[in-house]
């Protein structure tokens, strides 16, 4: 509550669970805030991949959301007319160009809570008793799964069972 009411909480960056393995496997987040000031809205980012595996070895992997995170943060601050530091090194800029050759969509307004980056008004955070867990605010979109008719699946299983029994009879005849 103090971070939101008595300071300017600017961002909550949700890190993947296990990012600090082998030391700790707990869920963590980075909070960006300015002492004093006031919070009007908070920018959330759900970081899925940090460029390393989430096991104890932490080997490099292809998926890396860090360039997108930094570019989105820069874009958000630019849209709000806030100062933007050039904090992206050559390596991250190169990764960003590889993953997003067209760049970050300039049409993004961060209101869509199904995306990796979105904003939450202070009022919504207060209504959630100042809980900064990203799962309180991010909307999950479920894909509808379509399955074949159960009768078709059952018939296919029966046919497979007949084939297996025939193969077992043939195998038994060889003994």
What are these model-predicted stretches?
Residues 1-174:
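A conserved structural/catalytic subdomain of Rossmann-like adenosyl-cofactor enzymes
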């Amino acid at each position: 509550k103090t971070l939101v009411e008595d300071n300017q909480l600017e961002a909550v960056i949700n890190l993947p669970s296990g990012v600090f393995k082998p030391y700790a496997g707990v869920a963590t987040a980075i909070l960006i805030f300015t002492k004093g000031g006031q919070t009007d809205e908070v920018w959330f980012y759900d970081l899925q991949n940090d460029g390393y595996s989430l096991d104890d070895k932490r080997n490099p992997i292809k998926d890396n959301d860090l360039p997108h995170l930094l570019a989105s943060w820069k874009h958000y601050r630019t849209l709000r007319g806030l100062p933007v530091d050039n904090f992206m090194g050559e390596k991250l800029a190169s990764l960003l160009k590889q993953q997003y050759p067209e760049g970050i969509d300039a049409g993004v307004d961060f209101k869509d809570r199904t995306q990796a980056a979105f904003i939450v008004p202070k009022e919504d955070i207060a209504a959630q008793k100042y809980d900064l867990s990203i799962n309180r605010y991010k909307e999950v979109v479920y894909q509808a799964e379509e399955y074949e008719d159960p009768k078709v699946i059952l018939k296919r299983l029966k046919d497979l069972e007949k084939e297996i029994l025939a193969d077992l009879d043939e195998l038994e005849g060889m003994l």
